[in-house]
Regions:
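Conserved acetyl-CoA-binding loop-helix of GNAT-fold acetyltransferases
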Residues: 100, 105, 111-124, 135-136
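Conserved active-site alpha-helix within GNAT-family acetyltransferase domains
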Residues: 128-131, 138-162
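Short, Lys/Arg-enriched N-terminal segments with co-localized hydrophobic residues
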Residues: 3-13
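A conserved beta-turn-beta hairpin within the catalytic core of GNAT-like acetyltransferases
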Residues: 87-100, 110
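Conserved glycine-rich acetyl-CoA-binding loop
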Residues: 76, 106-117, 129, 145
Length: 218
């Protein structure tokens, strides 16, 4: 479980090859383009995650202290993680927890552990900030490596009260998490407007969309 590894709480962490640090405003367009490259044609033809990132930074739910990037020795940013607060609603009780994602790594740098290290840094810092848990939607096989498990095990469900394997939770404070149950209320930033996306796409080089096997929103 990666959250158990001792990571320095500094604003940056250096490996032999890469530097991990907090995102700066000067990184914004580069990391948005990175996110676009990372998610293009993965879940649907094209993607909208880069617009999610842009809108998240302007939202009240955004947690800038948990947004790390990975850069090479040549200062090229090859990975980035974004986190926000989400509400777990239990009738009239509202519990604020951490929501992970998007996490993006340039295709040519994937499968090198960069995404997991970014996640690790954010989880360690979130624990320091006092969050009870982190939730996300993602590949269960991948995120179990970072200590995530089915959110339903903790009594946490998606907005309509149902469960899905892709909705996962990682414990950061077990005592606090015992007091939390309910349904996740996804922020509207995760559902960008098609017209806004089309206009935003004009800022990037043209890129052909493809319908591919395995796309869940094709």
């Amino acid at each position: 479980m990666l959250i158990g590894i001792n990571i320095s709480p500094k604003d940056f962490y250096m490996s032999e090859v890469h530097t991990y640090r907090l995102e700066n405003e000067s990184d914004y367009f580069e990391t948005e383009n990175l996110t676009r490259e990372a998610f293009w044609d993965v879940y649907k033809p094209g993607c909208s995650e880069h617009l999610v990132v842009r809108n998240m930074r302007k939202a009240t739910c955004y947690i800038g202290e948990l947004s790390y990037v990975c850069e090479t020795q040549s200062k090229k940013i090859v990975g980035a993680i974004y986190c926000s607060e989400t509400i777990i609603l239990d009738e009239d009780k509202r519990h604020t927890v951490m929501c992970v994602g998007p996490i993006g790594v340039l295709p040519e740098y994937q499968k090198k552990g960069i995404g997991l290290r970014l996640l690790e840094l954010s989880l360690v810092r979130a624990k320091e900030l006092g969050y009870a848990c982190a939730v996300l939607f993602g590949n269960p096989e991948y995120y179990r490596k970072a200590g995530f498990t089915d959110a339903a095990r903790f009594g946490i469900h998606i907005a309509d009260g149902s469960d899905m394997d892709a909705f996962m939770c990682c414990t950061l404070d077990a005592d606090k998490l015992l007091l939390i149950k309910g349904c996740n209320q996804e922020d509207p930033i995760f559902f960008p407007d098609d017209a806004e996306l089309a206009e935003y796409e004009k800022l990037f080089p043209p890129k052909e969309k493809h319908t591919l096997p395995g796309q869940i929103f094709a």
